[in-house]
Amino acid sequence: MSVPAAPARAVGRPTAALPLWHLLTLSVYWLGMNLIWGGLDVILQARMDDLVGVAQAGRGIALMTVLGAITAMVVQPTVGAISDYTVSRWGRRKPYILIGTLFDVILLYGLASSNTFVAVVAFFVLLQFSSNFAQGPFQGYVPDLVPARQVGLASALMGVMIVLGRVFGTFVASIVGLIFGNIFLATVSLGVVELVTALMTLRWVDEGRPAPPRARSWRAIATSAWGRDILRHRSYVWLLASRLFFLMGTATLVGLMLFYLRRSHGLTDLEAGLWLLLAPAVIAVTTGLSTFPAARASDRVGRKPVIYAACLLGAVGIAGVGLAPSMPVALAFVVLFGMGAGAFLAVDWALMTDIIPKDTTGRFMGISNVFSAAAGPIALAVGGVTMDAVGAIELGAGPRAAFLVAALFFGIGALLLRPVDPRRRDD
């Protein structure tokens, strides 16, 4: 049975409240998508020394993620804009979710089977294409289907699913890939889980309102995703920039964690795998504990104060990890980091949903995720180069220096949030 959409105006946000189960079904695919990237964060770090050598590992990760991000930046808003006007028996978004997910599974198999840096990069870039082909349309569901008073809760659920996906992906990669040594099985398993969550979405979500009338060619719609009119939405642009820097901070910790464990603390792969199970579990718990209170607080005091608090927690957390003399101390600061990440994931998405126009949500959400996708490559380009440069002097200091640089990203994210007008728009 499908999840019925809330009654809606011809254009604009629905008005009738949705049951909690319906909100959960709108969020489950976030788990599947993020499980892939959480797992690959570990798998690709584990493989990079063998693919390009220890001295070039940071640059190798940076190059691969930059190429993948360029692909995501082109695909996601373009396909999101096209899906706004798509008419099919399944609705506007579902065809793209199905096609993208099926190709994800195929490309993960190819990536798992590849043994050269060039082949791994090629499959990674193609995976970014297929994943964003699905994600661009999918993230239009909350603005399409959720009434304004439930956006905070829906965003909190989305945040929980994102974190759970990242954590479970890390678990799969750490247990199957590092501890048991089967990188191939770990990689393929990620695609299987994503496929299950996609099928749940396709089965249970009713997309509700139809596409608006299409008065332009498909080419014009696709290119309109990049129209300069977006610059007139100044609060939206400032929020995009703020999101970029916050996520650069989180991407640095996640993207360089295995290097940190190996080089800064001298852990073996088995020891690192165990810590990679514990640290994400701590992040998951702290995120879960902070997400829903943060969403409720944002409904009372506003979205921006909660995001400011998240930036502070993130900066203190990652700086503490970078300076920690031992893993137990680092884990204590991971708690602060997780609390900040949970608060941000719950509230940033709600603020974005509040301020964008409601008739072309696929386009605006697609562009927003361009900045989300760009955060990882930019962070790893800066962090990877920093790690290699400092590591040439003292190997263990490289990841620590990268984490301290990342603390600055959170501060910049807070500053860029100041010009954002948080008032809700329903047009």
Residue ranges and their predicted role:
Residues 2-19, 207-241:
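Juxtamembrane intracellular "pre-TM" segments in multi-pass secondary transporters
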Residues 9-69, 237-242, 246-266:
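Helix-loop boundary and gating motifs at the non-cytosolic
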Residues 44, 133-146, 343-357:
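Intracellular juxtamembrane helix-capping segments at the cytosolic ends
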Residues 54-67, 185, 266-284, 398-400:
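Loop-to-transmembrane helix entry
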Residues 71-73, 152-174, 369-380:
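Glycine-rich segments within core transmembrane alpha-helices of 12-TM secondary carriers
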Residues 92-94, 177-192, 385-408:
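A membrane-interface helix-boundary motif in multi-pass transporters
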Residues 93-109, 305-320:
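Structural signature of the two symmetry-related core transmembrane helices
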Residues 112, 195-205, 404-427:
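Multi-pass alpha-helical transporter architecture, strongest
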